[in-house]
């Protein structure tokens, strides 16, 4: 069964189309209008072995907030749709990723209960054209749209570029683990409830 989802969303502020393949090879075709954001999404795709197409037209003449937040909403919806009924998958995933002086932790639970715990400290307002405060907004939107429990924590380091990049890559690795099949589940959902 292919685990591919395409989700579109159009508002007065943004026009977004995302296609996500959970069982890809790490290919990305990205155009958000924010170069550093594209770079982060490319890292996510490559390190999680997801194929990701993300086309965004946003009101960047205002600022990047709507573009980044709305991309997170659509991205989360694509994850939820691609994951499907969650039968046979690990459900949980975690990764601790080093990037030079930075160490980032990410843990994911595809529980159907949205929650974000984001503990990263930034020292500059922007990296490239991406407002650093929007990194949390992106992950918040992803977690709530995907209905996932998501923890991202900076364990060490101070370079904002490295912190953000490590967070995106750790998220990719954790989500890859959470979406992998475990044959011991025999197609069942990993929950005492029988469903998620």
Across the structure, where does each feature detected by a protein language model lie?
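N-terminal intrinsically disordered, cationic/polar leader segments
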Residues: 1-196
């Amino acid at each position: 069964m292919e685990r591919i989802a395409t989700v579109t969303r159009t508002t007065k502020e943004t026009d977004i189309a995302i296609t996500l393949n959970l069982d890809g090879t790490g290919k990305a075709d990205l155009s958000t209008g924010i170069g550093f954001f594209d770079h982060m999404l490319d890292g996510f795709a490559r390190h999680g072995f997801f194929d990701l197409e993300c086309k965004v037209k946003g009101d960047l003449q205002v600022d990047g907030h709507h573009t980044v937040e709305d991309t997170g909403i659509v991205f989360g919806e694509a994850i939820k749709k691609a994951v499907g009924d969650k039968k046979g998958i690990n459900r949980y995933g975690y990764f601790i990723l080093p990037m030079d002086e930075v160490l980032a932790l990410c843990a994911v639970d595809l529980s159907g209960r949205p929650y974000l715990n984001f503990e990263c400290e930034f020292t500059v307002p922007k990296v490239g054209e991406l407002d650093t405060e929007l990194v949390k907004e992106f992950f918040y939107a992803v977690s709530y749209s995907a209905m996932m429990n998501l923890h991202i924590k900076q364990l060490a380091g101070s370079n904002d570029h490295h912190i953000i990049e490590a967070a995106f890559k750790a998220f990719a690795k954790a989500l890859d683990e959470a979406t992998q099949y475990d044959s011991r589940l025999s197609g069942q959902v990993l929950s005492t409830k029988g469903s998620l």
